[in-house]
Amino acid sequence: MPYLTSADNTKLYVKEWGAGPPVVLLHGWPLSSDSWDDQAMAIADAGYRAIAYDRRGFGRSDQPWSGYDYNTLADDLACVIEQTGAKDATLVGFSMGGGEVARYMSRHAGKSVVKAALISSVVPFMLKTPDNPEGTDASVFDEMTAGMKEDRAKFFAGFFKDFFGVSLLAHPTSVEQLEWARSVSMQAGLKGTLACAKSFATTDFRADLAAFNVPTLIIHGTDDKTVPINPAGRAAAKGIAGSTLIEYDGAPHGLFATHKARLTSDLLTFLGR
């Protein structure tokens, strides 16, 4: 079942590994489901069914002109859950994917979900506003948009250095990892890339947090420059009743690569509870 069809006839690429309780993995911007491969293999080996799909506009999925708002993206997730028969599923959302988890929990009342995990997630609200003073200033997102429109490949070359915490003194990932990430990001359509950036930058998920009525794990790096921890992971932990927050001291955004062994272990522990 490599492709499913969404409610608006968008084809979504889906891969399923293993058999057992379903774990649906939602990737971050601007990557694809392949970014979850290390964790998906371990999850499948541990006796679970790992389900990962490419968000519309990214990877091998269709690149429609519209549908990059979080309501539509949550509806896409609902189609994946329904058409794969993922009953009693755990949802794991990385970065932008955490927003889909949050909106699904409210918009679809958490149907078929028994656990949720938010990894380096944009939830609850990224944008700096009078009532969200620790958010990111709108000018930062405006600069991102301008950079992508001018030279997307060059923009991503710089973007992924912060994403993976690469600097003159720190090299938590290889040069090849950076090149891979940029190549995957360039597979996405420009329209979807820009529209999704606007969606994760401006969507307020604070009202969605009350819908998390299942055990919820939150993992975030304290040195995440892409999605800073204070208005994201720490704020989400305060807003989701009974959630568990694990902070990775000094860690950047791209934990699936920079801290893949620890992240995999923490996810498997959470799944086994």
Language model regions located:
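Conserved alpha/beta-hydrolase catalytic His-Asp/Glu region
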Residues: 124-136, 146-210
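Conserved HGGG/HGGXW glycine-rich cap/lid loop of the alpha/beta-hydrolase fold
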Residues: 6-66
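Catalytic active-site module of serine/aspartate enzymes centered on a nucleophile-bearing elbow/loop
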Residues: 242-273
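Conserved alpha/beta-hydrolase "acid-adjacent" motif
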Residues: 225-231
